[in-house]
Amino acid sequence: MTLCNMNLHEFRQKYNYNVATKMMQQYLDIKFAHLDCLLLFRMGDFYELFYEDAILASNILGIALTKRGKNCEEEIPMCGVPYHALEHYLTKLIEENYKVAICDQLETPEEAKKRDGYKAVVTRDVTRIITPGTIIEENLISVTEPNYLTSLVIPKNKKTASICCVDLSTSKIFVINVPETEILNELARLKSREILLSENLKSSNISDSILKQFNCRITYQVDSFFAINKCEKIILDFYKIRDIKGIGEISNSQICAIGSILEYLSLTQKQNIPHLPIPKIINFHNYMTIDFSTRRNLEIVTNLQGNLYGSVLNTLNHTVTTQGGRLLYHFLSSPLTNIAKINHRLNITEFFYSNLGIVTRIRELLKNTSDIERCLTRITMNRSSGRDLLSIKYTLETAKTIKGLFSESYGLNLPHFIEKIIKPLSGDAELYNLIHMSIREDAPNNLNDGGIIKYEFHPKIAQLNDLINNKKLHVEKLKDQYRKETRIESLKISHNNVLGFFIDITPKNVNKILDPKFIHRQTTINSVRYTTYELQNLENELVNAQTLVIRLEKELYTDICRKVIEKSSYLKILANSLSGLDVFCNFAYIADEYDYTKPEFTNDLSFDIVKGRHPVVEAALRKTSKSFVYNDCHLSEAERIWLITGPNMAGKSTYLRQNAIITIIAQIGSFVPAKSAKIGVVDKIFSRIGAADDLIKGQSTFMAEMLETSAILAQSTKNSLIILDEVGRGTSTYDGVSIAWSVLEYIHDKLQCRCLFATHYHELTVMKNFLPALQNYTIAIEESGKDILFLHNIILGASNKSYGLHVAALAGLPTSVINRAAQILLKFEKISISKEKNILSNASNNLSLFNFEHEKPISNSKLDEEFKTIDPDKISPKEALELIYKFKKLV
């Protein structure tokens, strides 16, 4: 039986609760209330873990596993980490998707003794539960990516699911309805760190798919956690509204998604939730659909290894602020599908591209701004420092300077869309003055250190600090007095956290201490330490004054933070303006630096790219002083499919990716790596590129390929762009050719969308003769005897050779192996030529051979019965493939 399934009696019996020490009983009580967490239990200067938690954590953290006494003769496993290094160790636990409960001491040992005597146990309780989706510490989360906590609600007997997301670090929250078939695609876009799901979905296909595809934590909750009445009340209470319509027009499942996420935040943050705006209602169709495999294959925000280097994001990201980097990440994850909105962004990019002089100055100024979104969150959650307030102050100051730069350069002659961006930059004089007058420039990170409030801000602060300074001067006077009395010129008065103030002399001067007022405290190798009643009284007065100052500073700081929070709406608008400026100046910068051009958009099936380049490959070649070979792509209603053949290593895969990436970059509002680009808006991009066995899922290369292809054919629309590379290569040649042929026909006749289809099956090129919207293209090469030169140019025509032996030779295979392979290849070619001519001639002369619509249906009563039980809208691609195998047996 797992801990989570135990009742209180079983739990206490397991750990011998009745004979445990009071401290261990306290630990067990708190642990039982947080069975799904690793419990970090504060013990003095350490956070300690016990029993199973200790064994698990010691392995993850790489720290020693020890023991803390015995319970019924059984040793208690224990490990611990210093309190000041907590964030370092939390990072490792969160990376492994664990949930961690922080249990703090709520009183000092002295306070406990006053309350309950010498044997009193310090009061402790969980002050916060940290999960992958609820962290806000800068060291634990990416500065340039959102950190989403997501609640997924899938109503029974409905085809639409609801998703609510919150990024606690920036206090952003939104809700979206998605078709049930698009759930995984939407989760791929969001890249959530933690997903809340009903326990009823624990063994469902969706839960299984999330665990396999995404590196995130799934937190299961009982079904009642998502109950409509409960969730509606939570929303009304949280936002202090009387009617749910105050949120907007939302469905019941959206209410459940929002309410459940607010409840989870309340449970983990212990009521210390930042101010969250009313959730923004997002239209699913506003964004391009890009499924998980396509995002991975195109390496949009990470490379194939999950790292930033070599990704499109890494190539395009020359932003100078962290919030600008996050906005660019959002843009690339969520390309737009609305022409008006795309053109709005392009117009902003074009303005800055036409005014590069001001772009340089803006980018320099933006470097002086801070991530005020996350500063504001820390302030609202009572986890801030004076430096957060100073960051807001400096940002307000810089924003005003940037606004002045526009006024100085353009006066009133600014386009309205630029005016809208810079309007919030005017600043807030009241807020700026408040922080400027109150917070010291050298404010420490820790409020308990004192010295955060300027002396002149409050008369009592000045008075107490004068007292403290006078006491410190008095200490200096005492030092001089004691030197004269003892005639020890090297005598010092020092301070540490254990002894407080003490008189410090060298051992050789001990015989000069004759007056009994000098009370011995400590002897070390290099010093002997004393105190006096006079010094002790002075220290007590100093400590009391410092305590009063820190207490008053905390009160004043809390009041200042409250006033800052009152300005949170404006500060969030300011943060959005600054991040937008950063991104669009970044677009202008890369357009100028890398010779990008403004794309044009239409509502038809145009796809006219002239001299297009792959941005990532081009950037890599640039470092080696090599040039990228550009290529055109001209898809249209009349020529929707390009069938691309050519040798290995010629650049087919790069060409496929490049056109998909150009589309994505264009639809985020950026200029693109091409001489010109005219694109009919793409609603979905799908790619099937690369092949590898998925051993974890128990899938062969071919099965993985067929599942992806099946999903693409099921989800694409006429406005989609499909990129397919080597479909059918994971099986026998004739099976592969047949599948590839049939897929091409389906795309041409049924989907009628734009498609780039690369293949080594040269037999497919004959399809041009009877698929009017298909055209053959190949990669140009130059042959010189036995050698070939890859020119990387896409040209009209078809290739009948793959030049695989040439690539094998380049890879270093022995010459004897290459020569033998050439002999075998020649024999195979002689055998197959006559067969291929016969088959393909028959295919071109008799279309019905590959046109299943004209064939008579199979008469099979069992098959008919099976078909009647199927709801095509409710089966997954994997289930569809399994049915195909089943039907084949029936036939």
UniProtKB/Swiss-Prot annotation:
Binding site for ATP: G646, P647, N648, M649, A650, G651, K652, S653
A UniProt-annotated Pfam family: MutS_III
Molecular-function GO terms, alphabetical: ATP binding; ATP-dependent DNA damage sensor activity; damaged DNA binding; mismatched DNA binding
Keywords: ATP-binding, DNA damage, DNA repair, DNA-binding, Nucleotide-binding
InterPro entries on file: DNA_mismatch_repair_MutS (IPR005748), DNA_mismatch_repair_MutS-lik_N (IPR007695), DNA_mismatch_repair_MutS/MSH (IPR017261), DNA_mismatch_repair_MutS_C (IPR000432), DNA_mismatch_repair_MutS_clamp (IPR007861), DNA_mismatch_repair_MutS_core (IPR007696), DNA_mismatch_repair_MutS_N (IPR016151), DNA_mismatch_repair_MutS_sf (IPR036187)
SMART domains recorded: MUTSac, MUTSd
BP-aspect Gene Ontology terms: mismatch repair
Organism domain of life: Bacteria
Protein family: Belongs to the DNA mismatch repair MutS family.
Function: This protein is involved in the repair of mismatches in DNA. It is possible that it carries out the mismatch recognition step. This protein has a weak ATPase activity.
Protein name: DNA mismatch repair protein MutS
